[in-house]
Swiss-Prot record:
This is NADH-quinone oxidoreductase subunit C/D. Keywords: Cell membrane, Membrane, Multifunctional enzyme, NAD, Quinone, Translocase, Transport, Ubiquinone. Its main location: membrane. Residues 214-600 are annotated as: NADH dehydrogenase I subunit D. It catalyses: a quinone + NADH + 5 H(+)(in) = a quinol + NAD(+) + 4 H(+)(out).
Amino acid sequence: MIDLMPKKNTFLLKKKYKEDSNNSVINNLFDFFGKEFCFHQITLTGFPIIWIDKTLLIEVGKFLYHLSQPYIMLYDLHGVDERIRLHREDLPKADFSVFYHLISIERNSDIMIKVPLLENDLILPTFTGLFPNANWYERETWDMFGIIFNNHPNLTRIIMPSTWKGHPLRKNYSARATEYEPFFLNEQKEDLEMEGLKFKPELWGMKRKNDNVEFMFLNLGPNHPSAHGAFRIVLQLDGENIVDCVPDIGYHHRGAEKMAERQSWHSYIPYTDRIEYLGGCVNELPYVLAVEKLANISVPEKAEVIRVMMSELFRINSHLLYISTFIQDVGCMTPVFFAFTDRQKIYDLIEAITGARMHPAWFRIGGVANDLPQGWNILLKEFLDWMPKRLKYYINTALKNSILIHRSKGIAEYNKKEALQWGVTGAGLRATGLNFDVRKWRPYSGYQNYTFEVPVGSGISDCYSRVMIKVEEIYQSLFILKQCLCNMPSGPFKSEDSLTTPPSKECVFQNIETMITHFLQVSWGPVIPENESFQMIEATKGINSYYLISDGGTMSYRTRIRTPSFPHLQQIPSVIRGSLISDLIVYLGSIDFVMSDVDR
């Protein structure tokens, strides 16, 4: 094991560091902090992973944040229970680790900082002074692993109920309900749970009154149509003005990351559909791509085109629901019924291809489940002829309506700097004028072969600009679908790799080893080599990604699912303070989120 503990903070004694632009960020880190205090882990993630001692964490964060091309977005932050990991001989000694995934927009590159921790010292300094969006990520890391972040503004549970015992993502916390005592909700327990839901303003630094006014505290949700799911926001009100608010999440949590530790690499695919239940196949894509990296599996060209086609169909489907419900939130009912008619056409096409509608579980490691059926092209062409006219109808009848424009333009504004501070991705970020679409910047599944534009805003993201970005994205998705229709290649729809595809009858009858391998993989699942991989995609609501750790087994050792909706909801208080309740309703409609995506 490697000791990263510096004997003294030698980097603090150096003069102001002059960055070498010809050096990689790794070498700049090594030059400044000393190579002996940094360990570079080689993985299949596609970006450098640097282990450092926790005493250097804040300084390393500041160093990366203040580079000439800075790592300006904290993309993700979470933990790993390292205690029973078998293949970590060359890594620093650790019972737990916390990783900090940072993105540099100017470099179009990522870096991950990992901090090893021992079980008797699970304490780290908070990152919130540098990145405000670290707040919720640190709360979730404490919630799931019990790692403490010193000087955190309010280190309380965020996903699990406040009455919960234990930290679910620890390896000694069972994933099976059968290993626990039967659960009974008697009157005493019910009272305890209800007390746990009671909001206490003082715990959040809120005053009940000031010299002139006594504030009202109002629960919006968790069962309110404008909350778009099981989501509660506690509002501190002065009349109808929002003084402050506290989003409360976790009601839709299903333990998706824990489930991945007890499912085979194949059998976890259906769970990915339900992370963001409107995205369908889009959610499957980052997972199967990450597993394919681990297994070094190449995907046939036809499978890549089919994956893109299905992803864009689900993108349009999700955007139609978003646009129509946004219009409904502002006060117009008719478009939502028209949108469901249009979405039915998409579902008919999806069902014809996959056999299912919302949750097909159709992508496979190495390809897709089946070849395209006869007549798929006719259904797709009919939809491509239909949709542009309908989209024009939405724009002319609703989105150009003066009342809607007045209710949404200039409401819930933020700029590019604020968006990056809070980890905003997708249409919300692009509305600020930043052209960052993973399909263009970091192409996957052959997106580099398609011609399409990335819609961007004029500099300020408000409710109206966010919805209009999504409208234009539908046009671009239709253009991509037309290219899929005209250029669908022939050939196989899945890889012939033995990890993904059963062998042919000829091979089975001629080679006993082939039959044995097939039996083991069908019975227990394929064994994926030990390593780490990462894949991000441009999902329907922003950037979605899977960070996978394989320990050389038939199941994932750690599956981290980073969803866009989680940071988008964390941003709400900073945007909506000082606004009216009616503005909050429009703002919530403009974010585009579902709670399954937030809570996982």
